């Protein structure tokens, strides 16, 4: 991922993550934006030069961007490699690009010496959950909430 691609991706990724957090937690969008910014500061402190991080731009055979993958060390500092973000352009969904990016994440994680890979998925994202389950991912923990 080039510096220009990183800048474009990061702005969109922060906003999308903030909207997901706001929806999942029932918090104001501005609070969720602060959480998203802090997450990126913590896990991407050096941008594309952050040690152990892979930022992959998925491209089709014509070189057109179809999606991105952010893979890095586990947030806890130990354990499996971690998929922080995977995004396929809305116009390219359903064509197998999400699966291809997930397979690339697994390849990169193995190359880095990992024997396990993990991710978080919002409970409302049924399409992503089906993809992950079809690739052999299983729930390790489930967080539940109820508004009062």
Residue ranges and their predicted role:
Residues 85-88, 94-111, 130-134:
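Conserved acetyl-CoA-binding loop-helix of GNAT-fold acetyltransferases
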Residues 81, 114, 126-127:
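Residue-level signal for the short linker/turn that defines the boundary of a DNA-recognition helix
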Residues 83-86, 117-121:
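Conserved hydrophobic beta-strand within the GNAT/NAT acetyltransferase core sheet
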Residues 115-116, 138:
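Residue-level detector of anion-binding/catalytic polar loops
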Residues 3-89, 104, 108, 139-148:
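Acetyl-CoA-dependent GNAT
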Residues 99-103, 123-141, 146-148:
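Conserved active-site alpha-helix within GNAT-family acetyltransferase domains
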């Amino acid at each position: 991922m080039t510096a220009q691609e990183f800048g474009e991706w990061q702005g969109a990724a922060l906003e999308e993550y903030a909207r997901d957090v706001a929806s999942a937690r029932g918090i104001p969008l501005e609070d969720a934006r602060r959480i998203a910014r802090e997450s990126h500061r913590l896990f991407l402190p050096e941008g594309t030069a952050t040690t152990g991080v892979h930022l992959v731009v998925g491209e089709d055979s014509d070189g057109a961007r179809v999606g991105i993958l952010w893979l890095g060390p586990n947030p806890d500092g130990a354990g499996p490699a971690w998929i922080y973000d995977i995004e396929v352009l809305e116009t390219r969904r359903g064509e197998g690009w999400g699966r291809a990016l997930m397979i690339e994440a697994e390849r990169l994680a193995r190359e880095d010496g990992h024997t396990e890979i993990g991710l978080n998925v919002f409970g409302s994202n049924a399409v992503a959950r089906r993809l992950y389950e079809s690739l052999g991912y299983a729930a390790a923990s489930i967080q539940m909430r109820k508004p009062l």
